[in-house]
From Swiss-Prot:
EC number(s) recorded for this UniProt protein: 3.6.4.13
Top-level taxon: Eukaryota
Keywords of this entry: ATP-binding, Coiled coil, Helicase, Hydrolase, Nucleotide-binding, RNA-binding
Bias kind Basic residues: ranges: 699-708
Organism annotation: Oryza sativa subsp. japonica
Annotated protein name in UniProt: DEAD-box ATP-dependent RNA helicase 32
Biased segments, Low complexity type: 43-56
Domain Helicase ATP-binding residue range list: 111-287
UniProt domain Helicase C-terminal: residue ranges: 309-462
Annotated segments matching region Disordered: 28-71, 699-755
Coiled-coil stretches: 664-715
Notes on the domains: The Q motif is unique to and characteristic of the DEAD box family of RNA helicases and controls ATP binding and hydrolysis.
Enzyme class at the top of the EC tree: hydrolase
């Protein structure tokens, strides 16, 4: 059994830590780098600067901290190893046990400035070690401040999603396990909110999502970060500071102290003054270690693009998986319904490799279990963009993007799931012919993305549309899921802001029908996109009054050309249609507008007048609310008859009275007296009837009690003999008898029987008296 430490040993430990902190602070102040400086690149022959040898020559105390007697504090702004930094012994031991010895470029550039207490805005390629670049400063900051459980929250790390927050928390556990700090991972969509509220005030480090943290700030008792918080870290800062998290982040930052250290890291960093002012960055150090690099992606990443028609994407994906059964593949799709549908269908078709899917609607524990299973061996993971940022999985061989990303930054984050930490990886993206503009943007000089075009091998392309259709017949629920996948994909394309790449009008009706057939659907689902007129392409607007459209706030329907509408087989499902039912049948459009989307045009008046866009309401039209004129004079209500003529307000309910009709008051009073007399007679009858009913109820109750008493007496007579008979006779003499009027004959017979019995008893007594005499 381990013996507890004595008070003297604990005191010696505190003194030793105080001396170490004092030496570390002196070292940091003496050797801190100048603002705006960056470490020089390392030469291949040496792994550390020249002054590293002097630092290793015995000018160290215990654990690698320079002793006070040495009188020197080596510079650490250009070191290459973690043990050359002014770090505590506990942090160095944790790094060594976790296997971290050499620093990456972002760590060499960011750690010296972060250890000095400066705000840092860091950007580096995916997989370059950004997480460790802020974990170490957090641990050292709290250690030098002698932070303990009673001090409360000292650091908050914000993450855009649950999975990345869990990954950051694991790094804190590995590196800081020798420290005595308490840490918690606080994310949404998981159970245990009450348990979190009970312990959150005792936590020193919180790794959380903005929404969950804001919930605790508003609901948890005594949870206050306005005075004690020391350091704020935002990972994937460009996404956290995006408009999707804007309100949450602003509310969180408003409750934090103004004096603090702030660290921001991401692969695609923002330098917007407005965004940086929101998190109160003060004179930050801008660190972009790969800013001068020739590529924005890792050098070990091979990137390919393939032009694939929309209806051939699933066939191409299936063929690709069948040719790479010994690989670990990550597949990105644009919507949750697509992920579910492709996963379920491919699972039924059995490609010969394990399949998994992950999306944002899963519980946090389920997501963690799926990630752990995906790390084990060869597998295919279908995912939404929840997996695109920050998650670290080793040895991902291929990243396949079936759907086009919304921008260059998302593309970089997606392909960054492979080729991490100088390992090799490959990425492939499927682009429709209508999306070739994205390929031009990827190959542009400012993007720095070396991507190669790869032609599909049609000979090895496997057609699985019929197989998918047979699966949908066997599993009807998958057919509904396929319809939703079809709708959500078109909706995702329609809602994208970059219309140079995502323009739904470039797709023809044949494309939609073929895409639905590739999903195994027997008919093409109907969808309705309601949009404002400002989203209608200008080349399809003709002579429409643009100024009038800008003033209008009513929704407008974008419909498909009626000439191409006949090529589709309509579906009677519960999906809205992309086009409304046409009000006119004679619609003539130019040949160049066939099979494309164009604004609905009214043909009510076509006599040499410019065509105007007809405003169509939604399926359920709401009635316009009428306003009451409060300034109108009283008594001015107006009503109309069936012919539209004005009538007095109460004329419609008044009775028409002839001119010869006269009201007779005597007849009215006579009728009233007659009714009163009838009511009095009925009252008398009702009272008599009520009395009779009460009398019968009372009699029935008495008879019931009598029968019960007689039964008890009969039972007692069997046990007590003649004594019981005497009691019965006595009781019968003193009690009254009640008989119904309908049973008079029975009562007379009973009286005769009683007289005979009395005579017999008297005779028996007489005989007994003679015998005794």
């Amino acid at each position: 059994m381990r013996r507890p430490r004595s008070r003297g040993a604990a005191k010696q430990t505190r003194l030793r830590e105080a001396d170490e902190i004092r030496l570390l602070e002196a070292w940091i102040d003496a050797g801190k780098p100048a603002r705006g400086t960056r470490p020089p690149p390392l030469s291949k022959s040496s792994s550390s600067p020249a002054d590293t040898a002097a630092a290793k020559r015995g000018a160290k105390g215990a654990g690698g901290v320079p002793s006070k007697a040495a009188g020197e504090h080596p510079e650490y702004g250009a070191c290459a190893r973690f043990d050359e930094l002014p770090l505590s012994n506990k942090t160095k031991d944790g790094l060594r046990k976790a296997g971290y010895t050499e620093m990456s470029e972002i760590q060499r550039a960011a750690l010296p400035h972060a250890l000095c207490g400066r705000d840092v805005l860091g950007a580096a390629k995916t997989g370059s070690g950004k997480t460790l670049a802020f974990v170490i400063p957090v641990l050292e900051k709290l250690y030098r401040e002698r932070w303990g459980p009673e001090d409360g929250v000292g650091c908050i790390v914000l993450s855009p999603n649950k999975d990345l927050a869990g990954q950051i928390f694991n790094v804190f556990q590995k590196v800081g396990k020798l420290h005595g700090f308490s840490a918690a991972c606080i994310v949404g969509n998981r159970k245990g909110l009450d348990e979190e509220k009970a312990v959150i005030n005792n936590m020193n480090i919180l790794v959380c999502t903005p929404g969950r943290l804001l919930q605790h700030m508003g609901e948890t008792t005594n949870f206050d970060c306005s005075q004690i918080q020391q350091i704020l870290v935002i990972d994937e800062a460009d996404q956290v500071l995006d408009k999707n998290f804007q309100e949450q982040v602003d509310n969180v930052v408003s409750q934090l102290p103004k004096v603090r250290q702030t660290l921001l890291f991401s692969a695609t960093q923002t330098k917007s003054v407005k965004d940086l002012a929101r998190v109160s960055l003060k004179d930050p150090e801008y660190i972009s270690v790969h800013e001068e690099a020739t590529t924005a992606t890792p050098d070990t990443l091979e990137q390919y693009a393939m032009i694939v028609p929309l209806e051939q994407k699933l066939n191409m994906l299936w063929s690709f998986i069948k040719r790479h059964l010994k690989s670990r593949i990550l597949v990105f799709l644009s919507s949750v319904k697509q992920v579910k549908f492709v996963y379920e269908v491919f699972k039924k078709l059995r490609p010969g490799i394990s399949l998994r899917c992950m999306h944002g609607r899963m519980k946090y524990e389920v997501q963690q279990a799926i990630v752990a299973e995906f790390k084990e061996g060869h597998s295919v993971l279908f995912s939404t963009d929840i997996f695109a940022r920050g998650l670290d999985i080793e040895d991902v061989d291929w990243v396949v993007q079936v759907d086009c990303p919304e921008n260059i930054a998302l593309y970089i984050h997606r392909v960054g799931r492979t080729a991490r930490y100088n390992k090799r990886g490959k990425a492939l993206i499927f682009l429709c012919p209508e999306e070739e503009k994205m390929l031009e943007k990827l190959k542009a000089a400012e993007s720095k993305i070396p991507i190669h075009i790869k032609k599909p091998n049609t000979e090895q392309l496997q057609q699985i549309s019929q197989n998918i259709a047979s699966v949908l017949v066997q599993y009807p629920n998958l057919q509904q899921l396929g319809k939703r996948a079809f709708v959500t994909y078109l909706k995702s394309v329609y809602l994208q802001s970059d219309k140079e790449v995502f323009d739904l009008s470039r797709f023809s009706m044949e494309n939609f029908a073929a895409y639905a057939a590739s999903l195994g659907l027997p008919v093409t689902p109907k969808i309705r996109f309601v949009s404002h007129k400002k989203n209608v392409p200008k080349k399809y607007m003709g002579d429409i009054d643009v100024k009038r459209m800008k003033r209008s706030s009513k929704p407008e329907v974008i419909e498909i050309n009626p000439q191409a509408k006949s090529n589709l087989i309509e579906d009677d499902g519960d999906y809205d249609i992309l086009y409304p039912k046409e009000q006119q049948t004679d619609v003539n459009m130019a040949d160049g507008l066939d099979d494309v989307l164009y604004p609905k045009v009214s043909t009510a008046d076509t006599n040499n007048e410019p065509e105007k866009v007809t405003q169509l309401g939604n399926k359920s039209v709401k009635k316009k609310k009428l306003k009451i004129n409060v300034h109108r004079p009283l008594g001015t209500r107006v009503k109309f008859d069936d012919e539209g003529h004005t009538i007095p307000p109460f004329a419609s309910i008044a009775e028409e009275v002839g001119s010869g009709d006269v009201i007779d008051k005597d007849k009215i009073s006579q009728r009233y007296a007659e009714m009163l007399r009838e009511m009095q007679e009925h009252d008398k009858e009702d009272k008599l009837e009520h009395k009779r009913i009460l009398r019968e109820k009372k009699l029935q109750k008495k008879l019931k009690l009598k029968r019960k008493r007689n039964e008890e007496m009969d039972a007692g007579s069997e046990n007590s003999g003649s004594e019981s008979d005497r009691d019965q006779r006595t009781a019968s003499k003193g009690k009254k008898r009640y008989f119904n009027s309908d049973d008079e004959e029975g009562s007379k017979d009973a009286a005769k029987d009683g007289d005979v019995l009395a005579q017999q008893e008297a005779l028996a007594l007489k005989l007994l008296s003679k015998m005794h005499s």
